[in-house]
Amino acid sequence: MWNPAVYLTYADHRGRPYYDLLSRVDAREPRRIVDLGCGPGNLTRTLTQRWPGAVVEAWDSSEEMVTAARERGVDARVGDVRDWAPLPDTDVVVSNATLHWVPEHPDLLLRWAGQLRAGSWIAFQVPGNFDAPSHRAVRDLVSSARWAHLLRDFPFEKSEVVRPAAGYAELLTDAGCTVDAWETTYVHELTGEKPVLEWIGGTALRPVRAALPDHDWQEFRAELIPLLDAAYPRRADGITFFPFRRIFVVARVKN
């Protein structure tokens, strides 16, 4: 279960890649914009500010996130991105930090590129930090003798969850798109006692939390904390620097 409040703990940090992604989408007067994986809707509603004449459609697989998005005035619905197909007036498809949860997402991108009209845009961003110390620490624990039998379905057990930017560029260029793809590492300045744990608790650790009863979850956290503290030491001034690599792709279906 997704917790919108936990996810929004670092809303400013999580929001910056969204704006960086959309800054490269040069759609002038789109008729319909679709946000796949809209989360709590705090970023989705900015789409209507930029393109006030567009219909904005939002999807998320979490009922809790959809409820939070609707409370912000977003026309959100519960749905799986695998089931989504563009309507004839869809001009922009946006997906922010969602597609890495779908192993077959390259196939979805090819399908969408074939279904969208010429001139339409596909813009997505996915984390590229699955080999970062934070994720390696989680994977090491998940695969340890203590936890492996309880967490055998952990979705990020391998670091090859997403492709590099060049891989997506090749995929969508071959599908008939003009592609702008890049990677950025954000160095987030976090504060608090256990900020990295709090950050990944709202995303990557969610499957672990869902699989474990409370007492096991507390034990797992206790084992993870020193690993994160060693990888991301807190400075004397209270700041913890958290490098986070992200992969961006903006593709336009050719005329």
UniProtKB/Swiss-Prot annotation:
Keyword Oxidoreductase: no
Entry's Gene Ontology BP terms: methylation
Domain of life: Bacteria
UniProt keyword terms in alphabetical order: Cytoplasm, Methyltransferase, S-adenosyl-L-methionine, Transferase
EC number: 2.1.1.144
Broad class of the protein's primary localization: cytoplasm
Catalytic activity of the protein: trans-aconitate + S-adenosyl-L-methionine = (E)-3-(methoxycarbonyl)pent-2-enedioate + S-adenosyl-L-homocysteine
Gene3D superfamilies: S-adenosyl-L-methionine-dependent methyltransferases, Vaccinia Virus protein VP39
One example GO MF annotation: trans-aconitate 2-methyltransferase activity
Keyword Methyltransferase: yes
Protein family membership: Belongs to the methyltransferase superfamily. Tam family.
Role summary: Catalyzes the S-adenosylmethionine monomethyl esterification of trans-aconitate.
Name of the protein this chain belongs to: Trans-aconitate 2-methyltransferase
Organism for this UniProt entry: Mycolicibacterium gilvum (strain PYR-GCK)
Gene: tam
